[in-house]
Amino acid sequence: MIKLENIERRYASDEVETTALVDVNLEVAEGEFLAIMGPSGCGKSTLLNTLGTIDRPTSGHYWFGDQDLAAMDEKALAKFRAAQLGFVFQSFNLIDELTIEENTALGLAYRKDVSGNKAERVAAAMDTVGIAHRARHFPHQLSGGQQQRAAIARAIVGQPKLILADEPTGNLDTANGEQVMDILTALNAGGATIVMVTHSPSHADMAKRRIDMLDGRIVASAMRAI
């Protein structure tokens, strides 16, 4: 499904050039749940942003099926993101002035190919994450765990081919973090492909495969023991 070939990402300023990703080669199979770990500044978020086409590689190829995303222009990438990707952020990134139902519907805002009733799709996404009873509430009326579940509903409502989660439990207490991980695990069991950045070894162990990064490189890869 996904193949990164010799990906490099360099940032240049007037005084120094920083290399965030160094010769990264990675494959992610359809239906996989991959966890990315490593110390702060190792390139985890840059790798996730590259997978999300938010950050463009300086060199290398990013194959998504038969498409080389590294060669696409910004307009084509924006269309690709809207159709194929779902994002879950550590800070939730919900819009305060919108209800949870309206926030969830934002996952369809830039989709022109959505079949069926959009309201039903939104309701189904909220039900999947156990937040339907909060549909008419605003983000500030929800706990952190509920807000993250709403953010996951927004990510999955468009039925993306790939879900990218950046520290999805980072702002949550243990109980809410476990609930979010249970949701992600259930989504993966249902066929969703997920790539997650985390600092939690126990949460990484819930993924099917884990890679470790250091200084912009993938230094280890291991499948979960069954």
Q: Where are the model-predicted features located?
A:
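ABC ATPase nucleotide-binding domains
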Residues: 225-226
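ABC family nucleotide-binding domain
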Residues: 1-213
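H-loop (His-switch) and adjacent beta-strand-loop-beta switch element
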Residues: 210-222
